[in-house]
């Protein structure tokens, strides 16, 4: 009879392997949970850059190019480009003046209102000027300052959800928050800024004469939808933006206050 040699398996080794696999699963679950929490926390923050600019300003094309680069680098970035009108009548020697086709007196007023408030950074009425979340101002072509401001934004005070509406040409906007948040911001305006996604303009006069300028997120209107209610969530129906258009919904009393919340239309 042939002898059979048995090779005992270490129970300790088995348990050690199971333990290691269990630990690995725990670590993976923990990492997933942390990632989910980070995503949730990130969604509580918003990054909105408002660029005040003009086709009549020779320093502005650099800021407009930077805005395009920032949008290409960060698909979650909210941006609104406001063209002021105070350059329209300025004569630049023999080049004359140029009336910016996107300029509006109300956008110049918005910039002035911002600078009545206590903006951090470099406040004042000038172009190009970038305002981040209605709290921080800097030169619109200063990538370093803008990037720093965009990485230190405040959490949203309310939640704005923008979804497809009941019909194919509408959007549904719902603004929610805790009872405390709604009470704190009761009466604050809820507005929608509509914009052209991009456009190129041939400038025929002023400091940028003979230049072809490409702009992004060019604001065409800023309209109040309603106010924050202390008692209920707020809901609105919007006309869906056309092709090469978009919109941003924001909670802000006026430009003398910060932007408390913002979200883009899908």
What are these regions (language model features)?
Residues 98-127, 135-266:
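Short, conserved sequence motifs used for protein processing/export or organelle targeting and
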Residues 41-73, 77-84, 89:
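Local sequence-structure signature of Cys/Sec-based thiol-disulfide redox active-site neighborhoods
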Residues 33-35:
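N-terminal signal peptide c-region/cleavage motif recognized by signal peptidases
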Residues 65-66, 94-96, 145-146:
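Short, glycine/charged-enriched secondary-structure capping and boundary segments
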Residues 29-30:
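Cleavable N-terminal signal peptides of Sec/SRP-targeted secreted and luminal proteins
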């Amino acid at each position: 009879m042939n002898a059979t040699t048995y090779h005992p398996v270490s129970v300790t080794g088995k348990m050690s392997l199971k333990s290691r696999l269990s630990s690995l699963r725990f670590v993976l679950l923990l990492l997933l949970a942390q990632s989910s929490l980070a995503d949730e926390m990130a969604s509580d923050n918003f990054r909105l850059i408002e660029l005040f600019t003009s086709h009549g300003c020779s320093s502005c094309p650099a800021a407009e190019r930077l805005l395009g680069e920032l949008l290409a680098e960060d698909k979650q970035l909210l941006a609104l480009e406001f063209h002021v009108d105070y350059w329209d009548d300025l004569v630049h020697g023999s080049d004359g003046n140029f009336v910016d086709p996107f300029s509006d007196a109300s956008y110049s007023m918005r910039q002035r209102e911002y600078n009545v408030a206590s903006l951090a950074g470099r406040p004042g009425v000038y172009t190009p000027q970038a305002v981040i979340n209605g709290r921080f101002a800097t030169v619109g072509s200063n990538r370093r300052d803008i990037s720093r401001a965009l990485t230190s934004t405040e959490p949203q005070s309310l939640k704005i959800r923008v979804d497809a509406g009941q019909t194919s040409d509408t959007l549904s906007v719902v603004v929610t928050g805790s009872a405390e948040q709604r009470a704190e911001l009761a009466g604050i305006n809820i507005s929608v800024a509509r914009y052209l996604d991009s456009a190129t303009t041939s400038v025929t006069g002023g400091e940028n004469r003979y230049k072809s300028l490409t702009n992004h997120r060019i604001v065409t209107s800023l309209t109040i939808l309603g106010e924050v209610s202390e008692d209920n969530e707020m809901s609105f129906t919007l006309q869906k933006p056309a092709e090469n258009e978009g919109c941003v919904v924001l909670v802000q009393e006026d430009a003398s206050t910060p932007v408390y919340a913002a979200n883009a239309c899908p």
